[in-house]
């Protein structure tokens, strides 16, 4: 629950404590509920984030190359950027990789959002046709449900539409593909 608590703190600092206006916070809360995080812990994390004395965590993206020229993106949450740069550089060096400059590999990746929804009573083709209007790029089914992939910017619109249709969201998140 610690990781989800930190995600809640960062989401509140970035977009405010109201999940109705902060889609990122809404997604993190939903993911917390999916792993049975108690409601008290969620509320405590939101309250802690509203406290001005709380350390300010920032998301920082590091780019580099692993052995054989494999592009690597490392997303971190830190309150001390200098320490984090040193740690990430150390890991790259230990693995015979190299830390790149800003923009050296990020262009190779698409920042996407994804949703896993309950497939009961839903047709994959119908969902795909309906959610293309909200930004969905790829929709497919597997044994755990229906997966929807879309650009990062479409997260709020798709989540709001799924909630308005009362479709159960099993999980949601962000990926770089």
Predicted segments, located by residue:
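Flexible hinge/switch segments at interdomain interfaces of large molecular machines
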Residues: 1, 19-22, 59-67, 99-109, ...
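Intrinsically disordered, Lys/Arg-rich N-terminal extensions and targeting peptides
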Residues: 1-20
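Translation machinery proteins
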Residues: 19-76
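Short amphipathic alpha-helix segments
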Residues: 43-50, 83-92, 117-134, 154-162
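RNA pseudouridine synthases
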Residues: 63-77, 84-110
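A common structural junction motif
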Residues: 92-99, 133-138, 162-171
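Short glycine-/aliphatic-rich beta-strand segments at the starts of folded cytosolic domains
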Residues: 106-119, 146
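Strongly charged, low-complexity linkers/loops
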Residues: 125-130, 142, 149, 153-177
